[in-house]
Amino acid sequence: MLAQIRTYTINRGEMDNFLKELQAVAIPMHEKVGIPIVASWVDRGQNEFIWVRRFEDQADREQKLNAFRELPEMADIRSRVAVKIAKMEIHDVEGAFAPSPARG
């Protein structure tokens, strides 16, 4: 399994608008091409949005990201979502070991 951890620094005062537009535009696009979003967090103190996308392997990643980039909705991403991002940090990582079982 591969994951992509993305950290966006959002323009000051735009976090709520960013989240609204992300859910309206970007999330449906990910669903359309089969890219699972496995987690997301907001650090309001740092004005950061952090999320994780998952891929089966490198070939799956390339195929799905190419399909994503070719969607006609990409113009909406740029005009409604990307303009609210001041900085973007992306890490492509692979699994190291299975998660620990929950302890009760």
Regions flagged by a language model, labelled:
Residues A3-Y8:
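Active-site-flanking beta-strand signature of metal-NTP-handling nucleotidyl enzymes
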Residues T9, V52-R54:
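Short hydrophobic/aromatic beta-strand micro-patches
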Residues T9-L19:
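Short, surface-exposed ligand-recognition loops at beta-strand->loop->(often short) alpha-helix junctions
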Residues N11-G13, Q58, G95-A96:
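Generic structural motif
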Residues N17-A39, R54-H91:
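An amphipathic, aromatic/His-enriched active-site/gating alpha helix that lines ligand/cofactor pockets
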Residues V42-R44, K84-G104:
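Long, low-complexity, Ser/Thr/Gly/Pro-rich intrinsically disordered segments that act as flexible linkers
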Residues G45-I50:
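The conserved glycine-aromatic submotif of the RRM
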